[in-house]
């Protein structure tokens, strides 16, 4: 890896050339970036992106990828002449029940900081890898809670104008694992998150608990509120059993987490599925239909934990959680896409339901 000091060219940010991206992502796949620019402050993020976007408009810059934790992205092997801006601004401030986290802050550290101040609302989102800035993009959720439940506003850099402004949550079109900020192509982001503000509960209690597996672990009833630290501990234990807490020594955690979102279908599709399988189909109410459990669909379609079962396969389903596509060592983005297509097409052939990917796919497609 070559490093160089470019002075004020990129607002004082750290610049390196010929950088392998695989070690910077939780899936551990990706090409070698021509240039990696690491921004440790918000001013650097803004200055670097303004510079690169000006160059791109003049045809003087190749593709630009912006990311922080690298936990929800699959980067194609063949991307050439790629410039990567790594967002590493990480200040977290707490004022009363308001928590403000810069985009590069490690998400789980934000959760811990809130709990240590007696604030509830984020504990069910414990253990999720990645950065604070990624949470509104994806509308991150787990165990019955979504981050949009507590986001008040997001500070954005508009890539087309270079302007920075706070945007209220109501203008972000939050939905299930999506928002107006999410783009199918991670190279075409119209706006970049700089900071996120959350309004939490200062009563010392968690968000209402509604996820059956979690309430059972805590010995509580649905709708009850627990002590945030206890809820966090239970969530981390559940995630660890599913290989959803990062561990460099455990290849089941070399993933982007759940690769497919839970599909939302019309009620008649759910009824057809129940009749087809003759089973009690896990399902949840959704605003625009019925939400099904993607992991259940995978396993019933023949894609169980550890699929395809070949110990030499470089990419396999996790041995702990069928929804996670994992790198067993030496896998490429192409290997991941082959397995993802096999699973997606197999579920569609059996049930007539097409699963959609949860991570952002950059330079690759299903």
From Swiss-Prot:
Cystines in this chain: none
Reaction(s) this enzyme catalyzes, per UniProt: UDP-N-acetyl-alpha-D-muramate + NADP(+) = UDP-N-acetyl-3-O-(1-carboxyvinyl)-alpha-D-glucosamine + NADPH + H(+)
The protein's name: UDP-N-acetylenolpyruvoylglucosamine reductase
Oxidoreductase as UniProt keyword: yes
Family recorded in the similarity comment: Belongs to the MurB family.
Record-level GO BP terms: cell division; cell wall organization; peptidoglycan biosynthetic process; regulation of cell shape
Cellular location(s): Cytoplasm
PANTHER family in UniProt: UDP-N-ACETYLENOLPYRUVOYLGLUCOSAMINE REDUCTASE
Assigned EC number: 1.3.1.98
Cofactor field: FAD
A cellular component term, taken from the record's GO annotations: cytosol
């Amino acid at each position: 890896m070559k490093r160089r000091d470019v002075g004020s060219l990129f607002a004082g940010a750290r610049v390196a050339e010929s950088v392998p991206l695989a070690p910077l992502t939780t899936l551990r796949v990706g090409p070698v970036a021509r240039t990696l620019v690491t921004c440790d402050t918000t001013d650097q993020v803004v200055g670097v992106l303004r510079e690169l976007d000006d160059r791109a408009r003049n045809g003087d810059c190749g593709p630009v990828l912006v990311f922080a934790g690298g936990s929800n992205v699959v980067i194609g092997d063949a991307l050439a002449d790629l410039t990567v801006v790594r967002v590493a601004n990480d200040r977290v401030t707490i004022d009363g029940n308001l928590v403000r986290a810069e985009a590069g802050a490690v998400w789980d550290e934000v959760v811990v900081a809130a709990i240590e101040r007696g604030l509830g609302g984020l504990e069910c989102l414990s253990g999720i890898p990645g950065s604070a800035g990624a949470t509104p993009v994806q509308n991150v959720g787990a165990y019955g809670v979504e981050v949009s439940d507590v986001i008040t506003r997001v500070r954005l850099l508009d890539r087309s104008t270079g302007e920075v402004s706070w945007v209220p949550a109501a203008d972000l079109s939050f939905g299930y694992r999506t928002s107006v900020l999410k783009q199918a192509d991670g190279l075409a982001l119209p706006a970049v998150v700089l900071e996120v503000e959350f309004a939490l509960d200062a009563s010392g209690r968690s968000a209402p608990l509604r996820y059956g597996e979690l309430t059972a672990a805590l010995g509580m009833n649905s709708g009850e509120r627990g002590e945030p630290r206890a809820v966090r501990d239970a969530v981390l234990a559940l995630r660890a059993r599913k290989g959803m807490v990062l561990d460099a020594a455990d290849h089941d955690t070399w993933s982007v987490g759940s690769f497919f979102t839970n599909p939302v279908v019309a009620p008649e599709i759910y009824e057809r599925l129940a009749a087809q399988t003759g089973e009690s189909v896990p399902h949840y109410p959704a605003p625009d239909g019925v939400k099904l459990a993607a992991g259940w669909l995978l396993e019933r379609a023949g894609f169980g934990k550890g699929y395809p079962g070949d110990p030499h396969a470089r990419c396999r389903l996790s041995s702990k959680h069928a929804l996670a596509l994992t790198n067993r060592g030496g896998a490429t983005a192409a290997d991941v896409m082959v397995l993802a297509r096999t699973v997606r097409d197999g579920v569609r052939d059996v049930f007539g339901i097409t699963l959609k990917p949860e991570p952002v796919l950059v330079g690759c497609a299903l």
